[in-house]
Amino acid sequence: MAVFVVLLALVAGVLGNEFSILKSPGSVVFRNGNWPIPGERIPDVAALSMGFSVKEDLSWPGLAVGNLFHRPRATVMVMVKGVNKLALPPGSVISYPLENAVPFSLDSVANSIHSLFSEETPVVLQLAPSEERVYMVGKANSVFEDLSVTLRQLRNRLFQENSVLSSLPLNSLSRNNEVDLLFLSELQVLHDISSLLSRHKHLAKDHSPDLYSLELAGLDEIGKRYGEDSEQFRDASKILVDALQKFADDMYSLYGGNAVVELVTVKSFDTSLIRKTRTILEAKQAKNPASPYNLAYKYNFEYSVVFNMVLWIMIALALAVIITSYNIWNMDPGYDSIIYRMTNQKIRMD
């Protein structure tokens, strides 16, 4: 019995984290089910939902084949640390168990966007306020240049007139506590991103896809400070759920219903699953490679469209030739056909 309880605890610890779909367009189909998704394949799910290829096939039944000719214009990935799952409203959200919760990044997706849409300068924003880590490329440099990213900037932003402090029910949270301010500053970042994007709506209407990756650790710090059973943690969790729902609705609306908003909740990352060793049998790299970055070929945005057009036209022509040949081969012209008719000269001779 004790062994069974231990196994249940281990399973709950491994599969307690969640990967949720807050919003998705009709062209991206996520099936309802309890299929676990490995943590290291989260970037592949984001890439496939945007229409990009991945190195390894993803045999996960949660993501179905959607409309190949209508891909989402934006992917928004929000990762919340410090909690297994949030009390999201049932029915409006699709959630899957997350196994092997290892640290991941969307750098591969960002690189695909840069290589395919380098001339259109799409918006790529990766932000972790608690670590003061920010990565902005393309039009994000000009649009989000006023976004508060450092802790000092976030603190000053909170005490301005149009901050979220004036609209959020703080309840047990305090404005004078650094941990609480860190949590509230992350909510301010969510609000500012949607607010800045609403002033530049033309960015959400271009042909290049956009990527937003946000890492929120404020709830984790509140749990460490007050405890997960504290009133502060419960209030912060409820405030975060409301803020995430509003943020998802705003981003989904700004992109005209053509955006995927995803949420990853992780209690803690399992760093023991990360392999950092190298084998001594690893093949040696060339001393002077032609390209040290191993860059992929730059394909045109219309590559998949043209390929499908040529493919189906060739299939249609091949079927037309086969059907025509079959009909000619089995054609019975009959005795009234011109093939069997006799000329007038032949009739006179007879």
UniProtKB/Swiss-Prot annotation:
Q: Name one GO molecular function term.
A: signaling receptor activity
Biological processes, Gene Ontology terms: angiotensin maturation; central nervous system maturation; endosomal lumen acidification; eye pigmentation; Golgi lumen acidification; head morphogenesis; intracellular pH reduction; lysosomal lumen acidification
Its keywords, alphabetically, are:
Cell membrane, Cell projection, Cleavage on pair of basic residues, Congenital disorder of glycosylation, Cytoplasmic vesicle, Disease variant, Endoplasmic reticulum, Endosome, Epilepsy, Intellectual disability, Lysosome, Membrane, Neurodegeneration, Parkinsonism, Phosphoprotein, Postsynaptic cell membrane, Receptor, Signal, Synapse, Transmembrane, Transmembrane helix
Motif Mediates retrograde transport to the ER: chain residues: 346-350
Q: Kindly give the InterPro entries that the UniProt entry links to this protein.
A: Renin_r_C, Renin_rcpt
Instruction: Name the GO cellular-component terms.
Output: autophagosome membrane; axon; clathrin-coated vesicle membrane; dendritic spine membrane; endoplasmic reticulum membrane; endosome membrane; external side of plasma membrane; extracellular exosome
What does UniProt say on post-translational modification here? Answer: Phosphorylated. Proteolytically cleaved by a furin-like convertase in the trans-Golgi network to generate N- and C-terminal fragments.
Q: Which residues form the signal peptide?
A: 1-16
Compartments, record wording: Endoplasmic reticulum membrane; Lysosome membrane; Cytoplasmic vesicle, Autophagosome membrane; Cell projection, Dendritic spine membrane
List membrane-spanning regions.
303-323
- How would you describe this protein's topology in the membrane? Single-pass type I membrane protein
Instruction: Spell out which residues lie on the membrane's Extracellular side.
Output: 17-302
Q: In chain numbering, where does the site feature Cleavage fall?
A: R275, K276, T277, R278
UniProt keyword Transmembrane, yes or no: yes
Q: Subunit info?
A: Interacts with renin. Accessory component of the multisubunit proton-transporting vacuolar (V)-ATPase protein pump. Interacts (via N-terminus) with ATP6AP1 (via N-terminus). Interacts with ATP6V0D1; ATP6V0D1 is a V-ATPase complex subunit and the interaction promotes V-ATPase complex assembly. Interacts with TMEM9; TMEM9 is a V-ATPase assembly regulator and the interaction induces the interaction with ATP6V0D1. Interacts with VMA21 (via N-terminus); VMA21 is a V-ATPase accessory component.
**Associated disorder, per UniProt?**
Intellectual developmental disorder, X-linked, syndromic, Hedera type: A disorder characterized by significantly below average general intellectual functioning associated with impairments in adaptive behavior and manifested during the developmental period. MRXSH patients manifest mild to moderate intellectual disability associated with epilepsy, delays in motor milestones and speech acquisition in infancy. Parkinsonism with spasticity, X-linked: A syndrome characterized by parkinsonian features, such as cogwheel rigidity, resting tremor and bradykinesia, and variably penetrant spasticity.
- Record's function text: Multifunctional protein which functions as a renin, prorenin cellular receptor and is involved in the assembly of the lysosomal proton-transporting V-type ATPase (V-ATPase) and the acidification of the endo-lysosomal system. May mediate renin-dependent cellular responses by activating ERK1 and ERK2. By increasing the catalytic efficiency of renin in AGT/angiotensinogen conversion to angiotensin I, may also play a role in the renin-angiotensin system (RAS).
UniProt name for this protein: Renin receptor
Gene name of this polypeptide: ATP6AP2
